[in-house]
């Protein structure tokens, strides 16, 4: 029954400002999907073209990484989460400008609970425990070790799947830091 169906509409942002480039205002190549919070928070006609990364043509994933700083994390304590440029892109001002313009540090500061959960799971489900789960249960059902990691960490861990679920890059980067995503 069609009345039981519902649709989710993505919010679209113009990469090239429509006030400056009106002829591009309806071009699909100029419309970038984004969350409504980001779209309303960072709207404006400020010219940023050339100063920030274009999400269709440049890969933020290859230029920046999330990491957590944890010496020993007692229960109830906060976790320190940061975004830093990868070594080969340390002088990439466009990546830095993207982080600044979209206030990614502040936005991901709000997701520290997710980072903490990933860190906690990484402590319990290390590579040995993943192997144990795989051999004792999942292998007989036809799953792979990657599937087990996806189940445990509630995310996709292959690079190709980074756009399939929210916070996948955050999860992948933290697990890479703990050598669980290799």
Give the location of each predicted region.
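Short Cys/His-rich metal-coordination motifs, predominantly Zn2+-binding knuckles/fingers
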Residues: 1, 37-38
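The −1 position to Zn-ligating cysteines in a subset of zinc-ribbon hairpins
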Residues: 34
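Domain-level detector of nuclease and nuclease-like folds
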Residues: 41-102, 106
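C-terminal, charged low-complexity interaction regions
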Residues: 84-182
């Amino acid at each position: 029954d069609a009345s039981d169906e519902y649709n989710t509409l993505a919010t679209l942002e113009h990469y090239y400002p429509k006030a400056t480039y009106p002829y591009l205002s309806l071009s699909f190549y100029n419309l970038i999907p984004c969350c409504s919070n980001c779209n309303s928070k960072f709207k404006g006609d400020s010219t940023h073209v050339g100063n920030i990364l274009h999400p269709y043509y440049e890969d933020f994933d290859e230029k920046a990484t999330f990491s957590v700083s944890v010496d020993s994390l007692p229960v109830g304590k906060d976790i320190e989460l940061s975004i830093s440029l990868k070594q080969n892109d340390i002088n990439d001002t466009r990546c830095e400008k993207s982080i600044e313009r979209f206030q990614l540090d502040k936005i991901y500061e709000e997701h520290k609970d997710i980072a903490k959960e990933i860190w906690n799971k990484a402590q319990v489900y290390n590579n040995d425990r993943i192997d144990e789960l795989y051999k004792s249960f999942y292998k007989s059902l036809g799953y792979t070790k990657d599937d087990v990691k996806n189940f445990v960490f509630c995310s996709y861990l292959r690079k190709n799947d980074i756009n399939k679920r929210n916070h996948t890059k955050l999860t992948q980067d933290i697990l890479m830091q703990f050598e669980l995503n290799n």
